[in-house]
């Protein structure tokens, strides 16, 4: 890698971080966080419901505000950073993309499952026609091979994406997994096409994986204040910047401003600690979509189950983002299995009298 190359810092506190508090950021929260990030000189700030434009729904959870309210508030606040947003084809539409652009978004990350890049074409093309920066975002990147993932990135590039991401939605990639995926990208993408890493911290590898990605030539790094994000969170922004600083990398951010924002503004908003614990570790171990965490915990409480059991079964069934409705199905199947086991249990001597 070129140590003098400027690493593009993409903050996701106001989008992925929304998962951690069930999409309940107030507009005031968004403005305060955006102001701090802008002061710290991050390059972009992603803003949306955790599941992207129009994610606010019964299936994913309703947001405290609309995407446009958040985007407009942040766009009116920042002076340095570009406003980005996320769109999942099938949830967000071209109409929503145009509205986000009008509200102030200038970058869109079009997100698909890692084997379904073909559904991104319309949205990437429309984004480019609007004058937006279009980024391809390949979620659950651990679920396919490095070479197959690279071919999907090549499709997004052909549609007009100027940057393609390895997205570790489950926080399941090891450092060698990340290295192999970026090397595969390098083999097939044009030299001018940038690459990005979106890490989750479920195996405590969020920062390490981001560092490996940069060592392999990755241009953009996603991170969030105090790791605010789904599951055990994303790569903590202030930690990545501190590590990058120690390595002499050019990132352009003010570390102490980020440290203050993480501890004084973001961490107090968490109603469930964003950390590696029994449940979030299960996400990374089983390779489960990180935003399934809060939904699974609700289902576990409702049906008297362990959230870990639900998460591991979701991983076994290879469920992916967008299948949140299956969490209740899995819980009911597990409950039925427990009831069957109890009904057919062999009585002990004391129970038999």
Swiss-Prot record:
Active site: 19 (proton acceptor)
Lineage: Bacteria, Pseudomonadati, Pseudomonadota, Betaproteobacteria, Rhodocyclales
Residues binding Mn(2+), per UniProt: 16, 198, 200
GO molecular function, one term: manganese ion binding
Reactions performed catalytically: (S)-4-hydroxy-2-oxopentanoate = acetaldehyde + pyruvate
Organism whose genome encodes this protein: Dechloromonas aromatica (strain RCB)
Residues where substrate binds: 15-16, 169, 198, 289
InterPro entries linked to this entry: 2-IPM_HCS-like, 4OH_2_O-val_aldolase, Aldolase_TIM, DmpG_comm, DRE_TIM_HOA, PYR_CT
Similarity field: Belongs to the 4-hydroxy-2-oxovalerate aldolase family.
Record-linked NCBIfam families: 4OH_2_O_val_ald, PRK08195.1
Name by which UniProt lists this protein: 4-hydroxy-2-oxovalerate aldolase 3
Ranges of residues in domain Pyruvate carboxyltransferase: 7-259
The keyword Chaperone appears for this protein: no
């Amino acid at each position: 890698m070129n140590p003098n190359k400027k690493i593009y810092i993409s903050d996701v506190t106001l989008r992925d971080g929304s998962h951690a508090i069930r999409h309940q950021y107030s507009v005031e929260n968004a403005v305060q966080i955006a102001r701090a990030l802008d002061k710290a000189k991050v390059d972009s700030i992603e803003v949306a419901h955790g599941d992207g434009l129009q994610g606010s729904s019964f299936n994913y959870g309703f947001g405290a505000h609309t995407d446009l309210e958040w985007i407009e508030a942040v766009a009116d606040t920042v002076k340095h950073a570009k406003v980005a947003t996320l769109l999942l084809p099938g949830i967000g539409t071209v109409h929503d993309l145009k509205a986000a652009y009008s509200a102030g978004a200038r970058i869109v990350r079009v997100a698909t499952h890692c084997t379904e890049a073909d559904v991104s074409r319309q949205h990437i093309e429309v984004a480019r026609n609007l004058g937006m920066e279009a980024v391809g975002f390949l979620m659950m990147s651990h679920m396919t091979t490095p070479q197959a993932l690279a071919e999907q990135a090549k499709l997004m590039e052909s549609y007009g994406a100027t940057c393609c991401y390895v997205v570790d939605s489950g926080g399941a990639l090891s450092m060698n997994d990340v290295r192999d995926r970026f090397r595969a990208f390098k083999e097939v993408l044009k030299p001018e096409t940038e690459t990005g890493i979106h890490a989750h911290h479920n195996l405590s590898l969020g920062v390490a994986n981001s560092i490996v990605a940069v060592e392999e030539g990755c241009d953009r790094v996603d991170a969030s204040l105090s790791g605010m994000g789904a599951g055990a969170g994303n790569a903590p922004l202030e930690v990545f910047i501190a590590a990058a600083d120690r390595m002499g990398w050019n990132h352009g951010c003010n570390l102490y401003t980020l440290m203050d924002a993480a501890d004084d503004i973001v961490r107090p908003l968490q109603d469930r600690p964003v950390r590696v614990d029994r449940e979030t570790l299960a996400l990374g171990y089983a390779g489960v979509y990180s935003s399934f965490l809060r939904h699974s915990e609700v289902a576990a409480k409702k049906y008297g189950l362990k959230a870990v059991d639900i998460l591991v079964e979701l991983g076994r069934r290879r469920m992916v983002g967008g299948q949140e409705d299956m969490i209740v199905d899995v819980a009911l199947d597990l409950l039925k299995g427990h009831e069957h086991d109890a009904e057919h249990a062999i009585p002990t001597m004391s129970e038999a009298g």
